[in-house]
Amino acid sequence: TVPDLEM
């Protein structure tokens, strides 16, 4: 799965 970008 594609990792969610959380910044």
From Swiss-Prot:
Expression tissues: Expressed by the venom gland.
Gene Ontology CC: extracellular region
Keywords carried by this UniProt record: Amidation, Secreted
Source organism superkingdom: Eukaryota
Locations listed in the record: Secreted
Methionine amide sites (modified residues): M7
Full protein name: Cryptide Pep-21
Organism: Tityus obscurus
